[in-house]
Amino acid sequence: MAAQIDLKNITVQFGQNKAVNDVSLEINKGDIYGVIGFSGAGKSTLVRTINLLQYPSAGSVEVNGTVLFKDNKLQISKKQLQEKRRKIGMIFQNFNLLNEETVIENVAFALQHSRLSDQELEKKSLHLLELVGLKDKADFYPAQLSGGQQQRVAIARALANDPDILISDEATSALDPKTTNQILDLLYDLNKKLGLTVVLITHEMDAVKRVANKIVVMEKGKVIEKGELREVFLHPQKQLTRQFVGGALQAQHILNTYNFDKLAENAELYQLVYSINDVTKSVVADLDVSLNTKASILYGNVEVLSGEPIGTLAILLNLNELKQKEAIKFLESKNVVVTKLDKGVLTND
């Protein structure tokens, strides 16, 4: 099946700086695709090439089977580009609402170029507000709403032209954790109800793991890792990805509270991550029996990743180097992802 969004060898250069450096990305219809990285990684710059709010310096952009940009030039007319852009909704950290207009008027504003009658315009705007759970706030003004409610209005407005793609550019970064989860859950519901493809730009792994099915990790303008969320989450290959995963699994809490200087000579800390569906017994108890040792459990947690329960343990092993290797091999044979915890795992450098 052809990708709904196909970015090939995208480079975006500002002067001597390559904000995006030779990035290729395929996003299928119905994906919730997380684009994650720290500030300055090139996330927003890359994603804005999808609707050509940012023209690439090199590479090609294809959306819904139409090549929009190739060979350093636009492949369709300006009018056609405007039509394509209407089918790609966007929401941002700033809600960009019209403060002097009511909620329903803010939504209807996005339909000002449509051929709908006033009655049809009102009906559609109310339907969109119902989709985001704000039909009862239609006659309110933005100042009367909470931040989360204002973002819901922005989402309703972004859906006004019946897009099949929605880009969320750090849309939850200004919200509190509870409201963030509510907005993410709304995006997930819209994805399922409308078949909406969502491109989720964020620097928070918690946001990605809550709703995304695929992920791309960016650093300094390049893609360093991408794939199915479960695979990347359970088997991170790059240091930065391990850093994001470690933070999402609260490994940072372990590192910030544990005194490494007091570890015995052979003692090592490990993070164990595993699918509850894959591991049915106590892997630590099995390890103790297998190696005739006793692992100390410092931390344990279970969280849900795209509907799948994922377990996390932080354990302390006091074994010689050979036995440490045997322990890791044993755990990995049980479908457990093992990461040695040290002060370098979660550095932001």
Swiss-Prot record:
InterPro entries: AAA+_ATPase (IPR003593), ABC_transporter-like_ATP-bd (IPR003439), ABC_transporter-like_CS (IPR017871), ACT-like_dom_sf (IPR045865), MetN_ABC (IPR041701), MetN_ABC_transporter-like (IPR050086), NIL_domain (IPR018449), P-loop_NTPase (IPR027417)
Its EC number(s): 7.4.2.11
Cellular component GO terms, alphabetical: plasma membrane
Catalytic activity from the UniProt record: L-methionine(out) + ATP + H2O = L-methionine(in) + ADP + phosphate + H(+); D-methionine(out) + ATP + H2O = D-methionine(in) + ADP + phosphate + H(+)
Keyword Translocase attributed: yes
Entry keyword Membrane: yes
Source taxon at top rank: Bacteria
Enzyme class, first EC level, given as a word: translocase
Residues where ATP binds: G37, F38, S39, G40, A41, G42, K43, S44
Pfam families, per the entry: ABC_tran (PF00005), NIL (PF09383)
SMART domains on file: AAA, NIL
Major localization class: membrane
Membrane topology of the entry: Peripheral membrane protein
Alphabetized UniProt keyword annotations: Amino-acid transport, ATP-binding, Cell membrane, Membrane, Nucleotide-binding, Translocase, Transport
Function: Part of the ABC transporter complex MetNIQ involved in methionine import. Responsible for energy coupling to the transport system.
PANTHER family, A to Z: AMINO ACID IMPORT ATP-BINDING PROTEIN, METHIONINE IMPORT ATP-BINDING PROTEIN METN
Protein name from the UniProt record: Methionine import ATP-binding protein MetN
Organism from which the protein derives: Lactobacillus johnsonii (strain CNCM I-12250 / La1 / NCC 533)
Annotated gene: metN
